[in-house]
Structure formats: structure tokens, C-alpha cells
Amino acid sequence: MRDSQNTAQTLTESLKYFLKYRDQTVVIKYGGNAMIDEKVKESILKDILLLKTVGIKVVLVHGGGPAIGELLEKYEQKSQFVQGLRVTDKKTAQLALTALAGKVNKSLVQDIIRLGGNAIGVSGIDGKLIEAKPISEDLGYVGEITAIHPEIIERINQTDAVPVIASAGIGLDGEIYNVNADTAASRIAGALSAEQFILLSDVRGLYGNFPDEESFIDEINLTNLEKLVKEKKITDGMIPKIEAIKYAMFEGLGQAVLLDGRVPHALLLELFTDKGQGTMINH
């Protein structure tokens, strides 16, 4: 009886958040170890289905996880790197698209349907969703995002399906480009003027002195975030994520959250409780 009362109390307390986010857009970037662990993946997808059920326009953007590397290895495509970026020839770009849109994307759509929901999978090349141009000749088919055309997402959001987006780009020349998934997700969030952008990662969020838990940052604005970057208190792997978030916020994004995707039901805890889970970044 007490457990039932606690559940009812929790649902009642969550009501204000259901109302806050109803009919609002929440973009979720999914990647890292959260894509590898099947239990974690199922927890995340169940959370997403609940968000959709209570009237939130959820957009799921994903990277390739280990699938791209596995496919390149299978076809004996060796990777070369210039300044930390993978040099991408035309064959590698095609294989990356196969892994992203053919394997990972359709697997996520299949899982969402298996769990009782509905989903439509598209890649960034569909409807010129993610328009890109080459960063440099040295990197080949590595793309810089030049525009987002979100109409295809907006049409899917008018249905009962969750749009699942594979982060590939297409140029005006019709060529396919490898684009950074964090950047793609944040640019999509900005283009949709999303209420919130949630970037799932493998850490809890931001720290003033990582990994000291006492220095964990619950909430920060852009000004103080810049100070952390200048003081080099943010690790190298987190900097591209921060830059992507900053750009999206200038484009119209409301708030962003860095969240540990490995925590069970992290999305629900972040969106529907007072305390939240990760680091919230606001204007």
C-alpha cells in the first residue's frame, strides 16, 4: 500500500513538468557507451516513449557508436587522423552512412517499435536535413554543417512517431559527408527552437575540478561556462560538446543538459523531478 501511495505522490509531483514540456520539443543526442549496453539502451528508449506519450515532441539524434569502426575494419579500411579528425575518403563516407543509417538507425527504430512505440528513421541526407561542405581537402569527406532544414522532422512530429536521425550530411554537390554527431544534434535543436537539448554522455556532467564529486556543477550559465573553458577546467573531450551547445543556444535553443546516459531512467529524473540529474546550461 505504501509503495502505491509513493508512486501516486511521485506522479502528482511530476504533473507540473508534464504540463511544462507538453507540445514542446526536446532533442536528445544518443551515443557513447549508452549505445553499447543493451540494458541501458532499453532504459533510454522506454524513457523516450514515456516522453512521447505525455505529449512531448521528442527528437532522437544518434552517432555511429562502434558500428562505423567495425564496418571499416570488415572492409579493411584503415583510419588516418589529422588534428584528431578521421580522414574520410569516398568509400569510407559510404561505409559510415551504411553503418549509421542502415544498421544503427534501423536497429533503434526496430527497438522502439518492439517496446510498443512508433518511430521513423531518417538520415541527415533525407530532405537535405543536414547540409554540409568539406572542412578541408586534407580531410576528404569530413563535413562542416552549413545549414539545417528541419521540415522533415516537423512533419514526423505531427504523427505518433519518434523521429530517429542518423547524423550524416549532404553537400550541394550531392556528396555525402561525415559530420560530428554532437554538432549535428545541437544544430537541429537550435533549428527547431527546442525547449531543451539533452546530450547523453559517459560522465555525470560538468565539474569545477574533475573528478572531485564535491565540485560537480548542477547549473551554469554561458558566461560562467566560458570562464571554465578559459581556466582549462573542462576536459578536451567535453570541449566540442560545449561548443556545439553554445552555438545552438545562440540559434534559439532554450536550455541544454549534459547527462550521464548510463544512469537508469536518467531522462525521466532530469525532466520530471525538481533536483534533476546532470548539468543544466542556460543563458
Curated annotation (Swiss-Prot):
InterPro entries hit by this protein: AceGlu_kinase-like_sf, AcgluKinase_fam, ArgB, Asp/Glu/Uridylate_kinase, Glu/AcGlu_kinase, NAGK-C
Superkingdom field: Bacteria
Main localisation: cytoplasm
Any one Gene Ontology BP term: arginine biosynthetic process via ornithine
Record-annotated disulphide pairs: none
Catalytic activity line of the entry: N-acetyl-L-glutamate + ATP = N-acetyl-L-glutamyl 5-phosphate + ADP
Pathway: Amino-acid biosynthesis; L-arginine biosynthesis; N(2)-acetyl-L-ornithine from L-glutamate: step 2/4
GO cellular component: cytoplasm
Keyword Hydrolase included in the entry's annotation: no
Listed EC numbers: 2.7.2.8
Compartment list: Cytoplasm
Binding of substrate, residues: G64, G65, R86, N178
A Pfam match: AA_kinase
Gene Ontology terms, MF aspect: acetylglutamate kinase activity; ATP binding
Record keywords, A-Z: Amino-acid biosynthesis, Arginine biosynthesis, ATP-binding, Cytoplasm, Kinase, Nucleotide-binding, Transferase
Gene3D superfamilies, A to Z: Acetylglutamate kinase-like
Site, Transition state stabilizer: residue positions: K29, K241
Keyword Nucleotide-binding: yes
Family statement drawn from the similarity comment of this UniProt entry: Belongs to the acetylglutamate kinase family. ArgB subfamily.
Functional summary from the UniProt entry: Catalyzes the ATP-dependent phosphorylation of N-acetyl-L-glutamate.
Name the UniProt record assigns to this protein: Acetylglutamate kinase
Originating species: Lactococcus lactis subsp. cremoris (strain MG1363)
Underlying gene: argB
